[in-house]
Amino acid sequence: ADAYGDYRKVLERKDIDTVSIVTPDHWHIKIAVEALEAGKHVFVQKPLTLTLEENQLIRRACEKHSNLAFLVGTQQRSDRNKFMRAVNMVQKGLLGDIKHVTVGINGSPTGGPFPIADVPKELDWEMWQGQAPAKEYREKRCHYQFRWWYEYSGGKFTDWGAHHVDIAMWALNKNGAKQGPTAVDGTNCT
């Protein structure tokens, strides 16, 4: 397979009709919108958006390109032994009438201060940051740890909360409904 350091090269290719977006979170919407504009079907990993503005942007793009498939993936939906089993139990009424759901996640890793470092030669730090605010390179700012920096992600809420809120909504048959969470704070979503 061909490898590119710039996603736009993939979007230019006429022989590609579907893209799978598995980038750091802050890139999801920009690439997804540009992929739809390029006529590509899109599969994007969670979290789909980090802000309400991004949500509105992708909604408009999906409405404009309704002839294209647009899917958001979360791996917990395919875990047959845990989450699918729990969803089936709720949907069959085995747990009674569910009145309230609390989704809990533990805190994000903390630490630092993290030292400024030289950018590894194989990393295009400017491209990696993309539309995020320009910052000096620190090893703990990219790769897996990007999730704990709000320039690039939403912390544990978008990293794990997206999974657990999705499972609760799925179990309660709320995924297709216009109703979402009624209250959100730093520790609870009801």
Language model: regions and residue ranges:
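Rossmann-like dinucleotide-binding domain that binds NAD(P)(H)
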Residues: E126-T190
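A structural signal for well-ordered alpha-helical segments within the folded catalytic domains
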Residues: I29, V33, Q56, R80-M84, ...
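A contiguous active-site-proximal alpha/beta segment in oxidoreductase catalytic domains
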Residues: H41, T49-M127
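Residues embedded in well-ordered beta-strands within globular domains across many folds
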Residues: S20, K99-T102, Q129, D185
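Short loop/turn motifs at secondary-structure junctions
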Residues: D15, L94-D97, G180
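N-terminal glycine-/serine-/threonine-rich beta1-alpha1-beta2 phosphate-ribose binding loop
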Residues: A1-V44, E53-V72
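N-terminal Rossmann-like dinucleotide-binding module
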Residues: A1, K9, D79, V90, ...
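Active-site-proximal beta-strand/loop segments in catalytic clefts of secreted hydrolases
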Residues: D6-Y7, V22-T23, P47-L48, G73-Q76, ...
